[in-house]
Amino acid sequence: MASRFEISQQIYNSAYAMHSAHSHSYYELYYLMNGSCNMFIHDNTYRMEAGTILFIPDNVLHKTTYLNNAYHERLYIEFTDDYISDLIDILGFEQFKDTFYMHFFSIPDNHRHEFLSIFSVLINERQNSNALSPCVYKNHLQNLLILLCRYCDNKPASPASLVDTVSIADVSVQKAMNYIMLNYNKDITLDEIADMLHLNPSYFSKKFKAVNGFGFKEYLNTIRINHSEQLLLETDMSIT
């Protein structure tokens, strides 16, 4: 896999919406600087507030839906594991996964300036990159992850923490999403799942979109495409 390091800081108005869930073959560190959003990741939806960082693993489906604030500000870093190889070597890959994968890190106010300083260095370096820049990216990114371990309370993105993390996620929608994740390769219809959950199909359709920010059919197709892409990457299967 090709080496990758990208960093971006952007401000959105309240009308902005991500069109669809997506995944990629590299890691992403997502920092919500201002505003609030619902973060769909893997097969659950979580509430994120300003000052929270989420570590998104490679090949994991995710999507943000911003809530009704005046504006939202977010920063993300996309990177491959060669930029954090020293940290992985020290922790071991399994410990690294347990520490970071799909974890939410809440940055304490008294340490926020340290994180912002690192982000500022990385943004400036990316805008004025040269032959030495990869060394700067690697050193500061690993330092950033170390600070997350040392200073931040974190919660794994799991069903056990779901109630604490997002208040609007409806149990019936979570059950539907879990069912799709397990049965995406079968014929599935909205009416079938609504009946399984003892819900009116129209009500279920509206609830599904309200929780996730995208419709039932879009979610089902995205899950199928994501699994197909992973099969192509990880096996000798072809599309023919």
Model-derived segments and their meaning:
Residues 1-16, 58-128, 145-159:
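A hydrophobic/aromatic-rich effector-binding and dimerization subdomain
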Residues 23-39, 55:
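Short, conserved beta-strand element in jelly-roll/cupin
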Residues 150, 175, 179-226, 233-237:
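Basic/polar phosphate-binding segments, predominantly the helix-turn-helix DNA-binding elements
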Residues 33, 116-130, 177, 181-184, ...:
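Regular secondary-structure segments
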Residues 43-57:
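Short acidic-glycine-tyrosine-enriched beta hairpin
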